[in-house]
UniProtKB/Swiss-Prot annotation:
Belongs to the bacterial ribosomal protein bL32 family. The gene is rpmF. The keyword Mitochondrion does not apply. The keyword Nucleotide-binding does not apply. Pfam families: Ribosomal_L32p (PF01783). InterPro entries: Ribosomal_bL32, Ribosomal_bL32_bact, Ribosomal_zn-bd. GO terms for cellular component: large ribosomal subunit. It comes from the Bacteria. This is Large ribosomal subunit protein bL32. One of its GO terms (biological process) is translation. NCBIfam families: rpmF_bact. It comes from Kosmotoga olearia (strain ATCC BAA-1733 / DSM 21960 / TBF 19.5.1).
Length: 60
């Protein structure tokens, strides 16, 4: 059975653990139709447009 040769230091353990629980950064672009922030390559949830065409009907 595999056994570690040396004990991992506390700082090394914490440094590795921080990367697991770090929040994921989400890319944001601006909708050319309404100017609201949206995710790239997705339909705008505020106006329903994607690529200059209306995909979703947003009721006001």
């Amino acid at each position: 059975m595999a056994v570690p040769k040396q004990k991992r230091s506390r700082s090394r353990t914490h440094h590795k653990r921080v990367k697991i629980y770090r929040p994921i950064k989400v890319a944001v672009s601006v909708c050319p139709n309404c100017g609201e922030p949206k995710e790239p390559h997705r339909v705008c949830l505020h106006c329903g447009y994607y690529g200059g065409k209306q995909i979703l009907e947003i009721g006001e």
